[in-house]
Amino acid sequence: MAKVNITRDLIRRQVKERGALSFERRYHVTDPFIRRLGLEAELQGHSGCVNCLEWNEKGDLLASGSDDQHTIVWDPLHHKKLLSMHTGHTANIFSVKFLPHAGDRILITGAADSKVHVHDLTVKETIHMFGDHTNRVKRIATAPMWPNTFWSAAEDGLIRQYDLRENSKHSEVLIDLTEYCGPMVEAKCLTVNPQDNNCLAVGASGPFVRLYDIRMIHNHRKSMRQSPSAGVHTFCDRQKPLPDGAAQYYVAGHLPVKLPDYNSRLRVLVATYVTFSPNGTELLVNMGGEQVYLFDLTYKQRPYTFLLPRKCHSVEVQNGKMSTNGVSNGVSNGLHLHSNGFRLPESKGCISPQVELPPYLERVKQQANEAFACQQWTQAIQLYSQAVQKAPHNAMLYGNRAAAYMKRKWDGDHYDALRDCLKAISLNPCHLKAHFRLARCLFELKYVAEALECLDDFKGKFPEQAHSSACDALGRDITAALFSKSDGEEKKAAGGGGGPVRLRSTSRKDSISEDEMVLRERSYDYQFRYCGHCNTTTDIKEANFFGSNAQYIVSGSDDGSFFIWEKETTNLVRVLQGDESIVNCLQPHPSYCFLATSGIDPVVRLWNPRPESEDLTGRVVEDMEGASQANQRRMNANPLEAMLLDMGYRITGLSSGGAGASDDEDSAEGQVQCRPS
């Protein structure tokens, strides 16, 4: 993170009045604050798990909802309970929200009884009760631009909209996910962009996160009602429930291809929380069963794949756009392999460009190389990431980080390695190791045919390596995989089964509409990935931006800790024990370095920077890498093993050693080593 000089900035704030706001934003959350973050207080009052937290706009009130069906409004700065009321729900409360511009008087709750209730806190009464959902209500969302309107997401697959100005006791369906994904889809979370209140993000079953334009949907519905044939349409027209352009999907590029493997191991992917950055340009997703992902909504990118020179001309045309640099903006996320299709540049006769690193970055690179040599893969990745942030045009750093990703083998590491290899080759077409690692990554990501073509291309570009033991070993692996794939397809054909389904969360082909397939194929890839936590046990686990400039990312975890990462480097910087079992909720204060957390324990915990004289060791997880490795193993354990781990049992093979402990990936690489340069 950038160094801070508070004395200098205090003087500037006194001299320049306009600097007051920037001062507040800059010092909202800083690296020294993060290092001193510790437990300030525990708020006691609930008798069950605390499933949701919500700050008011000023930050002087904190609302909580619990399994005990009560909501409590706290004065968090003085650690006082101001109000406690039974909400009228008959099951666990999963979401609580203050209605904007209502003087902190109106509170909305959603619960497992499928109900949404609206409460007047001044008289401690429930003034509206909505029972339109047919399954558990998981999230409520509000928008400052529409102070009388709010939305709910429930496990019946519906996103409903409520208008408190209307006398009706019913809501209207804004989005029906079952129209697109079939009757088994469940909506889990939603949020409204703080800078564009017409933009609604929805997380549901499967790896895809959906963005909708509320205004376009309303205009579409209005035009349908006014059309001469309106009488033959229902509110959600089954032929075209949403207008073209009203939805955009986002997905981590490797997940659609991984779905069959995850499904076979009963590993469920579901977005448990979505939130926008304060400036509305980024979307953060806590993907249940996987990692935390950040999507850039301004500079969108397609998932990365591979194109061979012989299949591409000097100028490619895809989707009407010309591409001459080898990177295309195709529309695919794993179904068709031509998105961000990277065409390897010709390398015959080229001279490898040497980019000198400044001395301090050279030292960081050497430290990373030493960590790699000691098999400290995560430490090496973090050091390379620090260097990459300062020297984003150095091919060697990307190539070295790719090698560390390939060795570590956590979920998503091979795809990040693929991205780094492609970046290294774009910066240095003669990067031999990056070319070879690219073929290995494609193979590990199940792009077997593409891996074979990439390996053949590597042999043509670097003939001196064509008969190395590394090439021979990878070639044998690819050939065996191709034969296995061919046999599997023949058996499926003989049995009347269809081909592999890469973009479906279920095996029922007819449950996915054609419109849904198109949206999935056009989905955008992530910018950053954050690893270390575990999100498999609960489906309400949150991840949030921390800081006015979204400098940090925080997430709860199944191991009872919460994790803090630097946003730009994705490096893990702090792990704190926040619950005896599971941390689900993390809600940062709107203007202070102040964090509220909750989970299975019936308390709300408040965290802020502690005095330097205070001992913080009690809740600090010192071995962050060990905790991260244990969580990766937990995520990959079968459901029975995960249940036993949650009950406190120790399981041989899961309690020690690294995630994916086998390390034969590069054991036979011969002359083409995976060690860093």
Swiss-Prot record:
Residues 489-509, 655-677 are annotated as: Disordered. TPR repeats lie at residues 361-394, 396-431. Signal peptide: none annotated. Pathway: Protein modification; protein ubiquitination. SMART domains: TPR, WD40. The modification Phosphoserine is found at S352, S511. GO terms for cellular component: cytosol; nucleus. InterPro entries: DCAF8, TPR-like_helical_dom_sf, TPR_rpt, WD40/YVTN_repeat-like_dom_sf, WD40_repeat_dom_sf, WD40_rpt. Pfam families: WD40. WD repeats lie at residues 45-84, 88-129, 132-172, 182-222, 265-305, 535-575, 578-617. GO terms for biological process: cellular response to insulin stimulus; glucose metabolic process; in utero embryonic development; intracellular chemical homeostasis; multicellular organism growth; negative regulation of fatty acid biosynthetic process; negative regulation of transcription by RNA polymerase II; protein ubiquitination. PROSITE patterns: TPR_REGION (PS50293), WD_REPEATS_2 (PS50082), WD_REPEATS_REGION (PS50294). May function as a substrate receptor for CUL4-DDB1 E3 ubiquitin-protein ligase complex. This is WD and tetratricopeptide repeats protein 1. It comes from Mus musculus. The gene is Wdtc1.
